[in-house]
């Protein structure tokens, strides 16, 4: 066993320096075989032999076995192990309790300088010479805390006056003693990769212990390097903390702007009062309410207008039907009278029948004329109680089986406008002939009746296009996909077309014609060359590849127009 001096921090110093009142003498028991300090657990746990000696667990496992027994290394007494071996030997609990007290409990009356916490939270250290005084300096040679008065008294001799005394703030760190070799201070750090033990080591650990042959460095430079990295990390953490705090403040401000709240303001006479400040959420809700209120008002007006159109149609239709009822009543009365007159004539004698010949002839001629008129009226008038209703995209109502749409077909000369028109009208191919003036045809498709105006595309006729814009609901612009050199000219004319105020709300359908010709531009290429996404921004437009000869793609274009123009299909209202 060896004698160590343990201070309050658990660090040991040489026993030759026991004269300081800031230290206490404590007997620390070591294993008598390996001379390592006993531990509370692990391989260095103290275990009792039958003879009363204590040896660490690790050394007991290394002793030679004599059957099922071992001999004490000190007095050679035999101890039976039993089935459990060394694990079955009792631990020295008295020694374990002492070790635990040394590690966790206070040192005693001769312990290191007592520290206490002041009211302000700062550490207060008592003077080692006079505990009534507060220490202000530290003697690095005596390792004592002293007040200024005691420092002068205790170091008044020439020998002790040479001791270095520093303020408590500059007190050097006390050396930490090695846990395995407590008489030696920790001086090195192990840098060996894969080392499983603690990196701290003394000179004995470095030369002879578990760190023998390991890479190492001196403790102080290694600690200073780690401190420098910690300082850098602390600076980064402070910067990061400031960024987080700034971002958090911004988040708080954003939340306040969204939620709104009460704000203290001053009026004209300097009186402070609270005022509600609406947030962006409340403003957004108000905007939505206002928008849908206006939308509701607009829909109500459109509903009233649509109902008035239906009422007018019903009123006119009922007036006409009642007029037809009156006409049919009169006609039926006349026919009945003529029939009755004929029956009476049949009952008279021959002379009177002969005399009534001319009258009967005129009566029959009148009946034949009335029958012919009735047949013509009945053939042209369909007696149907349904009221077909169609709604446009702008919520206007159209009554009738077909909704009429005015369409203007424009484009450069030779693009195939007239060919497309007659293919849709008569489903037959027409040889290209330059259009002088215009062509107009009606094309019925689904529940729509397109009135299509085909205007000539020669350069001298293009200024006349503007005369056909009035009340136009859709523009069909035809492009010749096979003539690359005229795409820029088509782009120029289309750009002029889209600046017309009368066509501001008109739909734009672009037919990329002659897709059957070899080398024709694709729809994507024409879209790019005409800059349609930029040119038609804010407008409802669509480009459709087609072939006027075969009709490919033409009805797909009409389908798009139908979907854009009609909000709902034809509704039969009984």
Swiss-Prot record:
GO terms for biological process: innate immune response; intracellular protein transport; positive regulation of autophagy; protein ubiquitination; vesicle-mediated transport. GO terms for molecular function: enzyme activator activity; GDP binding; GTP binding; GTPase activity; identical protein binding; ubiquitin protein ligase activity; ubiquitin-protein transferase activity; zinc ion binding. Disulfide bonds: none annotated. InterPro entries: Bbox_C (IPR003649), P-loop_NTPase (IPR027417), Small_GTP-bd (IPR005225), Small_GTPase_ARF (IPR024156), Small_GTPase_ARF/SAR (IPR006689), Znf-RING_euk (IPR027370), Znf_B-box (IPR000315), Znf_C2H2_type (IPR013087). Changing residue 53 to A: Loss of E3 ubiquitin-protein ligase activity. Pathway: Protein modification; protein ubiquitination. Its main location: cytoplasm. It catalyses: S-ubiquitinyl-[E2 ubiquitin-conjugating enzyme]-L-cysteine + [acceptor protein]-L-lysine = [E2 ubiquitin-conjugating enzyme]-L-cysteine + N(6)-ubiquitinyl-[acceptor protein]-L-lysine. GTP binds at residues 411-418, 454-458, 513-516. Its EC number is 2.3.2.27. The RING-type zinc finger domain is responsible for E3 ubiquitin ligase activity. This domain is catalytically active as a dimer. Acts as an E3 ubiquitin-protein ligase. Plays an essential role in autophagy activation during viral infection. Mechanistically, activates TANK-binding kinase 1/TBK1 by facilitating its dimerization and ability to phosphorylate the selective autophagy receptor SQSTM1. In order to achieve this function, TRIM23 mediates 'Lys-27'-linked auto-ubiquitination of its ADP-ribosylation factor (ARF) domain to induce its GTPase activity and its recruitment to autophagosomes. In the C-terminal section; belongs to the small GTPase superfamily. Arf family. This is E3 ubiquitin-protein ligase TRIM23. It comes from Homo sapiens (Human). The lineage of its organism: Eukaryota, Metazoa, Chordata, Craniata, Vertebrata. The gene is TRIM23.
């Amino acid at each position: 066993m060896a004698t160590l001096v343990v201070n309050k921090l658990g660090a040991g110093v040489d026993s030759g320096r026991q004269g300081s009142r800031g230290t206490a003498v404590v007997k620390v028991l070591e294993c008598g075989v390996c001379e390592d300090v006993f531990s509370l657990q692990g391989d260095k746990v103290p275990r009792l032999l039958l003879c009363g000696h204590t040896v660490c667990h690790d050394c007991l496992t290394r002793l030679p076995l004599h059957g099922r027994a071992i001999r004490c290394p000190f007095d050679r007494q035999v101890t039976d192990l039993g089935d459990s071996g060394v694990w079955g030997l009792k631990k020295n609990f008295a020694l374990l309790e002492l070790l635990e007290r040394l590690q966790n409990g206070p040192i005693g009356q001769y312990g290191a300088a007592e520290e206490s916490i002041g009211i302000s939270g700062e550490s207060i250290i008592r003077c080692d010479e006079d505990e009534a005084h507060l220490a202000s300096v530290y003697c690095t040679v005596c390792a004592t805390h002293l007040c200024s008065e005691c420092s002068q008294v205790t170091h008044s001799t020439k020998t002790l006056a040479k001791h270095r005394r520093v303020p408590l703030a500059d007190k050097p760190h006390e050396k930490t003693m090695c846990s395995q070799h407590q008489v030696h201070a920790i001086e090195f750090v192990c840098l060996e990769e894969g080392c499983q033990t603690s990196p701290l080591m003394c000179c004995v650990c470095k030369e002879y212990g578990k760190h023998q042959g390991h890479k190492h460095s001196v403790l102080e430079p290694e600690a200073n390097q780690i401190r420098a990295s910690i300082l850098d990390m602390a600076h980064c953490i402070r910067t990061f903390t400031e960024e987080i705090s700034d971002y958090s403040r911004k988040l708080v401000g954003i939340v306040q702007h969204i939620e709104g709240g009460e704000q203290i303001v001053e009026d004209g006479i300097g009186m402070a009062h609270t005022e509600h400040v609406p947030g962006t959420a409340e403003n957004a809700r108000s905007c939505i309410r206002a928008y849908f209120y206006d939308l509701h008002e607009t829909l109500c007006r459109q509903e009233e207008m649509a109902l008035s159109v239906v009422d007018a149609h019903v009123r006119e239709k009922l007036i006409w039907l009642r007029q037809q009822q009156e006409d049919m009543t009169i006609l039926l009365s006349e026919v009945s009278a003529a029939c009755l007159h004929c029956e009476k004539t049949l009952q008279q004698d021959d002379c009177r029948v002969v005399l009534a010949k001319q009258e009967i002839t005129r009566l029959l001629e009148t009946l034949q004329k009335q029958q012919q008129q009735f047949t013509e009226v009945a053939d042209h008038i369909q007696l149907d109680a349904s009221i077909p209703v169609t709604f446009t995209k702008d919520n206007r109502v159209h009554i009738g089986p077909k909704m009429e749409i005015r369409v203007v077909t424009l484009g450069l000369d030779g693009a195939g406008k007239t060919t497309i028109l007659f293919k849709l009208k008569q489903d037959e191919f027409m040889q290209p002939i330059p259009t002088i003036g215009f062509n107009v045809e009606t094309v019925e498709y689904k529940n729509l009746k397109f009135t299509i105006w085909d205007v000539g595309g020669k350069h001298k006729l293009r200024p006349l296009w503007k005369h056909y814009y009035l009340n136009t609901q859709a523009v069909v612009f035809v492009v010749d996909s096979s003539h690359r050199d005229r795409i820029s000219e088509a782009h120029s004319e289309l750009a002029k077309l889209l600046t017309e105020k009368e066509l501001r709300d008109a739909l734009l359908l672009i037919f990329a014609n002659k897709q059957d010709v070899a080398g024709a531009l694709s729809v994507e290429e024409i879209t790019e060359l005409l800059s349609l996404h930029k040119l038609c921004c804010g407008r409802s437009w669509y480009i459709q590849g087609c072939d006027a000869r075969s009709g490919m793609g033409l009805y797909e274009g009409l389908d798009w127009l139908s979907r854009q123009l009609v909000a709902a299909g034809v509704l039969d209202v009984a």
